[in-house]
From Swiss-Prot:
Gene: ung
Membership in a protein family: Belongs to the uracil-DNA glycosylase (UDG) superfamily. UNG family.
Protein name: Uracil-DNA glycosylase
GO cellular component, one term: cytoplasm
Compartments, record wording: Cytoplasm
Amino acid sequence: MQTWKDVIGTEKTQPYFQHILQQVHAARDAGKTIYPPQHDVFNAFKLTEFDQVKVVILGQDPYHGPNQAHGLAFSVLPGIVPPPSLLNIYKELENDIAGFQIPRHGYLVKWAEQGVLLLNTVLTVERGLAHSHANFGWETFTDRVIAALNRHRENLVFLLWGSHAQKKGQFIDRDRHCVLTAPHPSPLSAHRGFLGCHHFSKANNYLQEHKITEIDWQLDTQLS
């Protein structure tokens, strides 16, 4: 069975990957504030091992405000107000999953620990500048991550929200995996079909059909 060490280890030796890291280090060395902090950039892989992945949620690039990003798509650190897209995710969960209570925080580690890979397609960003690292080469890396999951795992659920994620996931084998698409949960597009998509219950139904333990989407309502 593949591990992230195998997948990421292979990529780490590639010139394009070295170039990504050089660009990020150069930006940090120049005094720019880069999110997430260096020790959190690969958090998604630390918290959800390759053979434990059940659901993949693709984000775009990290939040670019102070103390928000910590390496998991859509998640923010404890003590930070949940951003608008995450609030819409919570609204959909409340509508979709019986008894779901909207938490007061946006810390999604509990999902990651159950097998939800919260993967941004670009892993770093400069403070206050959305998409500032979009051309660093991260997309190549995350394409290869998705390709490895597609090839070496079966019966995963991919939740692709918005055109960017859908384009990114276009080569996923629909015969081996469940691919669910909807507009992005951003306030600009959530009302066009994200709200009411029922992706969370559909994901659990698919896992159940394949005798895989479902995700408990409920988070602690507040962190102690």
